[in-house]
């Protein structure tokens, strides 16, 4: 990706406006999951080390534009950064200019409260741009949205660059999708083929093998002519599944774990894939399938993982995802994982340090995998050329 990188710039004495992703869950004024803040701290430290006058902003939740409410405030993020030892303050009225002292971080209040943010109003983009000498886009999770703080500001700022987080994300995705070391294996889980159809189509042109899981696998099992009982599947997409299976190596499970109801207490029965009864639902792959797929992963050189292979939230239907997770963790392949359920599985099985790259962007990750252009990246590339 040909973008200017923040790491390559001289920022001494420069006013630097960082668009981060600090959209963290907050309860009773306290941050309840700090992963996104922790991921942003190295970028803030780097800007300070380079002698920049640092401003950082983000969206938080879904406020109504033009109406500020206390629950939409980034104050809990400011409190967190203070506790982490930063000299930091919150600025609510910043569109007409901000005074930033050396060594301090000024957090600019929730961008989504500003009128015109979501529809990328150029006048708002110009106001953001006027605050800085250098704009740093470091929020991969919002890179698929053209908004005033992700796109407009990059259009008008004197210099627009990618922050370390965004640059690392683009490098990792490029490594997995543009020129992957082979064999390249993709794991695509989820409840519906329809929501991952573009992902499957795009990966069918790149991957040597695609492992499908969850409700998606059920549609492929039905397409192979097996009874899926009361399982979640999409009958109308069986022709699509057949076409994908004809043109791509998509192994269908040979055995499955079934239950009579979708509940944590439902008993799990393992059976051969062609023996599912009408009153049963498939909630996981069986041991034999999991071991076969683990072997495929073991021999891979690149693994892209998006989605579990079973209802791993329920202990009885967790084993398939657990075996696959550990196969990825123990593999020598370059592995990249993304998507909320995938990250939850990584946390559950304690393998975060064994995945080469964990993507922070849900929707943006999927759109990149689909081969779509991410507007916030596109404008950085355009600015790098000028």
Swiss-Prot record:
Show the GO cellular component annotation of the record.
cytosol
Q: Which residues does the record give as ATP binding sites? A: 196, 313, 339-342
Which top-level group of life is the source organism from? Answer: Bacteria
Q: What EC class does the entry list?
A: transferase
| Predominant localisation class | cytoplasm
Cite the entry's keywords alphabetically: ATP-binding, Cytoplasm, Glycolysis, Kinase, Nucleotide-binding, Transferase
Q: Give the enzyme's EC designation.
A: 2.7.2.3
Name of the coding gene: pgk
| Cell compartment(s), UniProt | Cytoplasm
Subunit (UniProt): Monomer.
Q: Which PANTHER family has this protein been placed in?
A: PHOSPHOGLYCERATE KINASE, PHOSPHOGLYCERATE KINASE 1, CHLOROPLASTIC-RELATED
SUPFAM superfamilies in UniProt:
Phosphoglycerate kinase (SSF53748)
Q: Name one GO molecular function term.
A: phosphoglycerate kinase activity
Pathway annotation from the record: Carbohydrate degradation; glycolysis; pyruvate from D-glyceraldehyde 3-phosphate: step 2/5
Similarity comment: family membership? Belongs to the phosphoglycerate kinase family.
Species annotation: Haemophilus influenzae (strain ATCC 51907 / DSM 11121 / KW20 / Rd)
| InterPro entries referenced in this protein's UniProt entry, alphabetically | Phosphoglycerate_kinase, Phosphoglycerate_kinase_CS, Phosphoglycerate_kinase_N, Phosphoglycerate_kinase_sf
Q: State the name under which the record lists this protein.
A: Phosphoglycerate kinase
């Amino acid at each position: 990706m040909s973008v200017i990188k923040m790491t390559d710039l001289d920022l001494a004495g420069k006013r630097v406006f960082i668009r981060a992703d600090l959209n963290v869950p907050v309860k009773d004024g306290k941050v309840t999951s700090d992963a996104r803040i922790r991921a942003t701290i190295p970028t803030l430290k780097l800007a300070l080390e380079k002698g920049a006058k640092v401003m950082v902003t983000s969206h938080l939740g879904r406020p109504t534009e033009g109406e500020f409410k206390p629950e939409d405030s980034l104050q809990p993020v400011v409190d967190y950064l203070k506790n982490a030892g930063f000299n930091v303050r919150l600025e609510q009225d910043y569109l007409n200019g901000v005074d930033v002292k050396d060594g301090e971080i000024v957090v600019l209040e929730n961008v989504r409260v500003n009128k015109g943010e979501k529809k990328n109003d150029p006048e708002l983009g110009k106001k953001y741009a006027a605050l800085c000498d250098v704009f740093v886009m470091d929020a991969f999770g919002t890179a698929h949205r053209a908004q005033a703080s992700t796109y407009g500001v990059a259009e008008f700022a004197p210099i627009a660059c990618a922050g370390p987080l965004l640059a690392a994300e683009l490098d990792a995705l490029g490594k997995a999708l543009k020129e992957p070391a082979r064999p390249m294996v993709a794991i695509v889980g989820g409840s519906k083929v329809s929501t991952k159809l573009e992902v499957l189509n795009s990966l069918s042109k790149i991957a040597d093998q695609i492992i499908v899981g969850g409700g998606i696998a059920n549609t492929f099992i039905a397409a192979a002519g097996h009874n899926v009982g009361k399982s979640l599947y999409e009958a109308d997409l069986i022709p699509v599944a057949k076409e994908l299976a004809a043109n791509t190596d998509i192994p269908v499970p040979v055995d499955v774990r079934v239950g009579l109801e979708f509940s944590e207490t439902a008993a799990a029965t393992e059976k051969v894939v062609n023996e599912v009864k009408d009153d049963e639902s498939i909630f996981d792959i069986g041991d034999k399938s999991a071991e076969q797929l683990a072997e495929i992963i073991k021999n891979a050189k690149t693994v892209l993982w998006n989605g579990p292979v079973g209802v791993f939230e329920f202990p009885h239907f967790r084993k398939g995802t657990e075996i696959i997770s550990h196969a990825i963790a123990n593999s020598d392949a370059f592995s990249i994982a993304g998507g909320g359920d995938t990250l939850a599985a990584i946390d559950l099985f304690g393998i975060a340090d064994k995945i080469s790259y964990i993507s922070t962007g849900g929707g943006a990750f999927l759109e990149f995998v689909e081969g779509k252009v991410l507007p916030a990246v596109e404008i950085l590339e355009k600015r790098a050329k000028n």
